[in-house]
């Protein structure tokens, strides 16, 4: 992210982060939340398949104080979408709209 900023990026994103991994405090996942002040503005993008987990993950992400919290509704990778997350969430619009992190906080 720092390299992107040095070469002129106005904003950078983290890799997308699994809401389930955030809830379990997986070290590799938690490390993605580390933000260097030189990276700002920076967005942290999360993905998940159910609302309670996404809300809990969003609370964890907020502690990292990103400039933007983004919800991934577009990843088509089978490992993600096949479990109902990312683009898989688009198969269940009522559930997607129930997600306060993605549908009401714009």
Residue ranges and their predicted role:
Residues 1-106:
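Flavin-dependent oxidoreductase catalytic cores
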């Amino acid at each position: 992210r720092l390299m992107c900023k040095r070469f002129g990026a106005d904003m950078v994103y983290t890799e997308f982060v699994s809401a389930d991994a955030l809830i379990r405090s997986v070290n590799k996942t938690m490390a993605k939340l580390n933000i260097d002040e030189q990276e700002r503005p920076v967005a942290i993008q999360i993905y998940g398949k159910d609302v309670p987990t996404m809300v809990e993950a969003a609370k964890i992400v907020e502690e990292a104080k990103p400039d933007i919290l983004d919800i991934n509704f577009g990843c088509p990778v089978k490992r993600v979408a096949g479990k109902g997350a990312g683009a898989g969430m688009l198969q269940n619009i009522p559930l997607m709209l129930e997600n306060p992190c993605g549908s009401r906080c714009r």
